[in-house]
Each structure stands twice: as C-alpha cells, then as structure tokens.
Amino acid sequence: MGTFKIRCKVENIVDREKSAIIPQMLVDTGSEYTWVSEHVLTKLNVSREKKDVSFVMANGQIVTRHIGFALLRYDKYFTVDEVVFAEKGDLLLLGARTLEGLSLMVDPRKKKLVASGPIPAA
C-alpha cells in the first residue's frame, strides 16, 4: 500500500483552547491506536487514564505506554479517541480506531484519506 503522512490537530477534550498541530503523522492502519508525543499531550494537559499498557511494536519488541483521551481533527472531520503517550523514538501514528471514528479510510492509490461513506447502524 505504501505510506503517507497527514497534518492532524490534537485538542484537550475539556479545554479545546489547548491544542497542537502535528504536521507529520504517519497513517498506519496496522496500529490500533493513535500515538502522539507525550510532550505534546502533557502540554495539552491530557490525563494519563490507563497506565503501563503493553504494546507489541512492529519489530516484535514489547513496550508499555500510558493512554489518555483527546479530540483529533483532520480536515473537516473530528473524533474523540484514546491516544498513546508516545516516547522519544516512537513513531507518531494515526491508527485504525481513529480512522474509523473519523469515518475515513485510506485510498491506497492516491495515498490519501477519503470519506468511508455512511455509517452502518445495525
């Protein structure tokens, strides 16, 4: 499929004045979660709600990270989702759950995000 990056805005879910632009976030449908720099999330006062959650990295390494809640925006789309506090050396990722919440999907030929269509209700 190839890879591509997007520009994404992250906001504190309670105080939306606290926000940051992530200029280069890798779209990764293989990652369940979205990973945002712990420095950015701390600056936005995003609380660490789940602590020491285990993740298996692409290279097989097991790491533990904290998880919080943030509002994520891309273009006219937005959703509230769990975000991983990415540490130094971790990739900044837009994961599959966030894509689903945004009602977006990957167009592999054009390497961009497109609307996924109507949301199934049943």
What are the residue ranges of the model-derived segments?
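Pepsin/retropepsin-fold aspartyl endopeptidases
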Residues: 1-122
